């Protein structure tokens, strides 16, 4: 069975009746009133979002936003586990990028706005992130990286993140990423010392305005 569908079933089963009521309220801008009235479970709501292409295994931001609004950290952990599992089956470049993003999430904190500007994310989008997660610093950082990755698409690369980190003097975090990338390269047997030199050049990140 599709791992993402398994996740959605698990999340739905973990929702209380109160959670479902709140979820329907939060989905008013995404799902028609008629479909909301017919929904008897979280899975019913998720099915509509899947059909409308607002939710899938590659685009979990809406699900994360809903679970954050419900303050269901236990269900958010299930989503985190799914995303880590998906990363495990991704191409090496995607796994490296996800690993770098996790390091940023764990270490950047309140400096994320400075990083956002060096990544080319507009002030409008920065404000939107703050409004979306007003009291959740960790989710603000995650959302920044999702916005950046979605806007740069195939140009999203570890070197861009490291260059932006060094550009705003977050050198300790940049060093952590470089060390992790070297370890990952050695582990996979594809280490290439020259591949890391570009990270020190402070190359500009692709625009994400």
UniProtKB/Swiss-Prot annotation:
Q: Spell out the GO cellular component terms annotated for this protein, sorted alphabetically and separated by semicolons.
A: CD95 death-inducing signaling complex; ripoptosome
Q: Does the keyword Endoplasmic reticulum apply?
A: no
Region annotated Disordered, chain positions? 187-209
Pfam families in UniProt: Death, DED
Quick one: where is this thing mainly located?
cytoplasm
> Domain DED spans what residues?
3-81
Q: List the disulfide bonds.
A: none
Question: Which InterPro entries does this UniProt record tie to the protein?
Answer: DEATH-like_dom_sf (IPR011029), Death_dom (IPR000488), DED_dom (IPR001875), FADD (IPR016729), FADD_vert (IPR049634)
What is the recorded post-translational modification?
Phosphorylated.
| One of the GO biological process terms | apoptotic process
**Location in the cell:** Cytoplasm
UniProtKB keywords: Apoptosis, Cytoplasm, Immunity, Innate immunity, Phosphoprotein
Coiled coil region boundaries: none
Q: Where in the sequence does UniProt note compositional bias of the Polar residues kind?
A: 187-200
Q: How does it assemble?
A: Can self-associate. Component of the AIM2 PANoptosome complex, a multiprotein complex that drives inflammatory cell death (PANoptosis). Component of the death-induced signaling complex (DISC) composed of cell surface receptor FAS/CD95 or TNFRSF1A, adapter protein FADD and the CASP8 protease; recruitment of CASP8 to the complex is required for processing of CASP8 into the p18 and p10 subunits. Interacts (via death domain) with FAS (via death domain).
Q: Please name the PANTHER family in this protein's record.
A: FAS-ASSOCIATED DEATH DOMAIN PROTEIN, FAS-ASSOCIATING DEATH DOMAIN-CONTAINING PROTEIN FADD
State the function annotated in the UniProt record: Apoptotic adapter molecule that recruits caspases CASP8 or CASP10 to the activated FAS/CD95 or TNFRSF1A/TNFR-1 receptors. The resulting aggregate called the death-inducing signaling complex (DISC) performs CASP8 proteolytic activation. Active CASP8 initiates the subsequent cascade of caspases mediating apoptosis. Involved in interferon-mediated antiviral immune response, playing a role in the positive regulation of interferon signaling.
| Entry protein name | FAS-associated death domain protein
Native species:
Bos taurus
- Gene for this chain: FADD
């Amino acid at each position: 069975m599709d791992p993402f569908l398994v996740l959605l079933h698990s999340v739905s089963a973990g929702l209380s009746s109160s959670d479902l009521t709140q979820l329907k309220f939060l989905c008013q801008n995404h799902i028609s009133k008629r479909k909301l009235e017919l929904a008897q479970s979280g899975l019913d709501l998720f099915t509509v979002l899947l059909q409308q292409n607002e939710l899938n295994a590659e685009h979990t931001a809406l699900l994360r936003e809903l679970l954050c609004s419900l303050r269901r950290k236990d269900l958010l952990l299930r989503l985190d586990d799914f995303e880590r599992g998906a990363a495990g089956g991704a191409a090496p470049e995607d796994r490296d990028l996800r690993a770098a993003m996790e390091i940023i999430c764990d270490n950047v904190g309140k400096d994320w706005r400075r990083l956002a500007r060096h990544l080319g994310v507009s002030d409008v989008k920065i404000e939107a992130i703050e409004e979306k997660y007003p009291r959740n610093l960790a989710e603000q950082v995650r959302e920044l990286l999702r916005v950046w990755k979605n806007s740069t698409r195939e140009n999203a690369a570890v070197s861009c993140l490291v260059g932006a980190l060094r550009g705003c003097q977050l050198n300790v975090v940049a060093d952590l990423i470089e060390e992790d990338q070297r370890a990952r390269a050695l582990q996979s047997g594809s280490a290439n010392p020259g591949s890391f030199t570009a990270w020190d050049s402070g190359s500009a990140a692709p625009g994400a305005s």
